[in-house]
Amino acid sequence: MRRIAILAVCFGLLAAPALAQSKAAIQKLEDQWAAAFNKGDAAAVAAMYAEDAYVLPAGDAMVKGRAAIEALWKKDMGALGGVKCTTLDVKPLGRSGAGEIGTCTFKTKAQPPQDGALKYAVVWKKEGGQWKLLVDIWNMDK
């Protein structure tokens, strides 16, 4: 019994750095996503999604597929800017997936501009060694 407890602790210690690395890697991807969005590059944003990805926008219809996702973001880029996303937590999902919880802040392009905030949950999957968004859902804080 004691041996099992020691093994469990050792495996837990080994997993902690891997999760920290995953969180840092996912945050880097979120930074790339926000940079592309803030530049108005809908094609670059859409390229971060898997071909069969789903986006479930708050208060809008669900979209599926990279082309539909690009159209959605192109529309939203006209109204929003200054996007900053923060990864709060990452959980592994098998060998090639990760679940992420985070928050985003943004500014509207209306006059006068208004600040906004939202929370999101996404599922990432590895395709050809690269992380791609598979499911993206969010809702507004207010």
Across the structure, where does each feature detected by a protein language model lie?
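Repetitive helical segments and hydrophobic/amphipathic motifs
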Residues: 11-12
